[in-house]
Amino acid sequence: MATTGTTVAALGSLSASAQEEAESGREFYELKRYILETEDQRTGLDAFLEDAALPALERHGYGPVGVFTDEEDISPVYVLIRHKSLAGVAEMIHILGADAEFMEKGAAFLNAPADNPAYARIESSLLHAFTGMPQMSRPSDAPGRVFQLRIYESPSVLTGQKKIEMFNVAEIDIFKKTGLNPVFFGEAVIGDKIPNLTYMLGFDSMDAQKAAWKTFIADPEWKELSGRPEYADDKILSGITNINLVPTKYSQI
């Protein structure tokens, strides 16, 4: 009975924590990765997202939605969806299912047969916004804008929290002042390569991206912060993934 009481108390604490997070304005981000095998699948996905999914998501308060891909390859396609709360993540599929316009315009994609699938697979991660940047930003509307998606893996949960602390304490501010314009920062709650944090940066151009990183690396505040023993990369990071992306013509970010 004592164990049950402890469990109930823990669940109550988690529920209270979730409510506090919702009230604090910290968003959740769903990062979907569509794996495609053919040009027809890419054409179908683009049509579904542009004509059905993005308009429906915007109608129900999930916008702006970002859609990104490699400039040269048809796959993968990344879709970034903003959620105001954890409940919104669970409710989204039911909200869209009750949207007649979405179901009608997305019918071909949603009902794709087994012998002609709409995609190979969908991979998805759920991210929780950092306290240092609780809400998404749209840093650029330039026609030639580019984005960087970066994933920092850590060797343990606590070292992962240390890297998040580093961002919240100062690194996010240093990013902003040196032209590394964040779209979001998120801690992976569900997904692969856990524990990890994931963030996205946006730039007017590839030249702007290169210039900003050069400025960042030379910044005195960054040198001081990264020189602190508790924030040494070899202690708190075990892998970094860097992905350069461009927005689709219908992306809202």
Regions found by a protein language model. Give the residues of each.
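Hydrophobic, ordered structural segments
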Residues: Y34-L45, D51-R59, G63-P139, S156-L158, ...
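N-terminal export signals
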Residues: M1-A18
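Short, glycine- and small/hydrophobic-rich beta-strand elements in well-ordered beta-sheets
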Residues: L14-S24, L54-Y78, K84, V169-T198, ...
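Surface-exposed interaction/gating patches
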Residues: I35, L127-D207, Q252
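Residue-level recognition of alpha-helix initiation/capping sites
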Residues: A47-F48, M166
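Low-complexity, Gly/Pro
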Residues: G12, A16, N116, K249-I253
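Hydrophobic residues positioned within well-ordered beta-strands of beta-sheet architectures
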Residues: E30-K32, V77-V79, I122, Q148-R150, ...
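Short N-terminal segments immediately surrounding and downstream of signal-peptide cleavage
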Residues: E21-R33
